[in-house]
Structures are given as structure tokens and as C-alpha cells.
Amino acid sequence: HAALSFLEKNSMEENLRHEMELTAYFINGILDLDPEEKALKVIGKKNIDNRCAVVSVQTPEIDMARAAFELDSEYGIMTRVGLHCAPSAHKTLGTYPEGTIRFSFGPENTKEELDKALSALAKITGLHHGEGIKNGF
């Protein structure tokens, strides 16, 4: 019943638009933090055309499981980490065997939560606050 009530207030189109805005915001936030993607890399397309509200990242210098554990234990940010039951896809993407950290966004997420995640990623990866960062770190 709660799901139906939610959908009566918010159309599927509104939810999708919101989720894709968050996806673009998060990708742009990562690219603002690390334009050359040396410490934090977006895996896959850098735009929202033909994608869903999921963003996978890789931190080449830090173990993916360690980074995901720190996101959870230190910042309360839940992610999924690893090969996501798709090792062949990760081989194709060049992220095997480490995998990625996967963030997904839903209709209840906010830009403030994404700012918290971006700030946590900046701290974990050692990225420093610098010019070009637009999300207020």
C-alpha cells in the first residue's frame, strides 16, 4: 500500500527525472573532484543518455572493499562493491579482478546525500579541495 501511495503522489516520470538528475550531479561531482580520473574513475559513460541511476567508480590506489567498508563504517553510506555477479563484464570494462564501488539512486535520495558521498570519496581517496569543485567541498 505504501508503494501505491507514493506513486500516487509522484509519477514514474517524475521519479525517473529526479533519479537521472542525481546521477548527472554525482558523475559531475566526481569529475569536478578528479577531472583526470587518476584517483577516482567513473566506469562507463560520463553522461546520462541511455543509462540508469547507477554509477560505478574505481579507486585505482585503494582496495575497493576497503573503500566501500570505510564509506559504510565511517560515513554511513551504503554501496555495493566487487564484480556484481558479472565478472565477464568487468573483464570487458578493465575492472577485473578488483571490481568497482556501485552507487545507486532512488526517488528519496537528495543532492545533500550525494554531496556527503562525494565528500567521503574525496577524503578516502586523498583528493584535496581545489579549484573547479562545484559541489561545495
Task: Annotate each PLM feature.
Residues 1-137:
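Pyridoxal 5′-phosphate
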